[in-house]
């Protein structure tokens, strides 16, 4: 499966050198409804197997769940769309290449080559989108148990981490979530690097960084049209740049 990770050029440099993706704080999610559904706990039940909890115990449990959720981190990817491949999303490029230098970068990653650790635990899944996000109801758990909050979050992870509001559907997101993992080893998993336009500074900079690599190719994106530049020497690269210029002058690729 192909995964696409959009990022800034400055971040790409670090990713390429280290061959790792860093997990980001889950609380930095761009979907306010996603965060709100976690903090909108409904007092579904204070009873568990005939045991009734006091309001103080129940309130403390909810607070512990808040804290537990905030310990989780995530890495977000984009999947292929029905109409086009994941690297060619106009809205995703609008987020990451909107400056005048169009300095956004998209990495194509072969998911089968990602080195997922056995420990700590990692959860990964395609995000589903809902027009109405329901809160995660607190109930069916012994609130006085020492690790009650931890078990509750694991049990309800699909609703907590893998559902977003319908308005974010264009992201077509695939998400990797972990509580303890700080970075993901993607050495050997990057198959292509994508930039927006053949005449921007970002493409020139990337060419100097990975020109000698046989693992990665360049993809020039003009709208939804593309021309792939595989690893090559500088002469071949410049020759194809002239070809791109000629194609664009003639009205683009057919």
Predicted regions located by residue number:
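Partner-binding and oligomerization surfaces adjacent to conserved cores of proteins
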Residues: 1-254
């Amino acid at each position: 499966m192909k995964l696409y990770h959009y990022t800034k050029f400055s971040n790409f440099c670090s990713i390429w050198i280290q061959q790792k993706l860093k997990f980001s704080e889950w609380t930095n999610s761009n979907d306010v409804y996603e965060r709100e559904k976690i903090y909108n706990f409904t007092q579904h039940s204070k009873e568990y197997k005939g045991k009734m909890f006091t309001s103080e115990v129940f309130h403390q449990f909810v607070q512990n769940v808040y804290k537990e959720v905030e310990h989780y981190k995530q890495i977000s990817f984009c999947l292929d769309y029905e109409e086009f491949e994941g690297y060619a999303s106009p809205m995703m490029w609008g987020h990451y290449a909107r400056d005048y230098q169009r300095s956004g970068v998209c990495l194509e990653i072969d998911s089968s080559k990602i080195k997922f650790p056995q420990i700590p635990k990692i959860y990964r899944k395609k995000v589903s989108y809902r027009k109405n996000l329901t809160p995660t109801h607190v109930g069916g758990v012994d609130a006085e148990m020492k690790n009650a909050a931890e078990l509750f979050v694991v049990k309800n992870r699909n609703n907590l981490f893998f559902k977003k509001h319908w308005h974010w559907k264009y992201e077509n997101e695939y998400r990797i979530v972990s509580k303890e993992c700080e970075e993901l080893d993607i050495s050997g998993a990057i198959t292509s690097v994508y930039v927006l336009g053949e005449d921007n500074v970002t493409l020139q900079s990337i060419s100097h960084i990975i020109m000698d690599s046989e693992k990665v190719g360049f993809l020039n994106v003009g709208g939804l049209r593309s021309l792939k530049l595989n690893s090559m020497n500088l002469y071949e690269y410049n020759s194809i740049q002239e070809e791109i210029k000629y194609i664009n002058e003639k009205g683009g690729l057919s």
